[in-house]
């Protein structure tokens, strides 16, 4: 190997070493910039979780413990967070706790609650996920963009709403229950048992894209030039209302 080759090889090795050091410190900075909050609260079986986020993903999972576990991962600039335990309700309100602050990083939550909890969560932007909950209420609201995924839900009252994004519900329909799903643009998919009893109003005014699947019985009819479906399955004890302005609505047999 001549002198020029050795020089070129040395320069390449030095460049690789410098890039490795830069990557290491950049990764360390990113990790250190993320702040974590973790706390566990004692809870009754019928506890209520009320969470208002600004931006970020919220995941709520039911578990077989009489306590609520809250883990929050805060990106820089870290948000202020002051959870409260008020008469059987755990309240977390990042909008209130950060009033007057122009810049606040995303906050991603992983929360575990008793199976029989009521869950009321909302965010301005980000995904909302709830699974394995069978309390009186499950409410998920996104004021701008994000997907809502509700899995293995057995609540009597369910409300899911966003502007842009998909909504997926997988669960049972309770007698006398109320279920409302609303989106402006995205896909709404409802996966429910075939023997569910409910009155239905489903509206897709722009796309007319409503698929009833196995639920397209004689008790259902399309009206308003296909923009709406009204009807009843079984004894109609529950109520399901679905509105999707510029997206699809689909029913799937569970």
What is the meaning of each model-derived region?
Residues 1-254:
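Intrinsically disordered, low-complexity terminal regions
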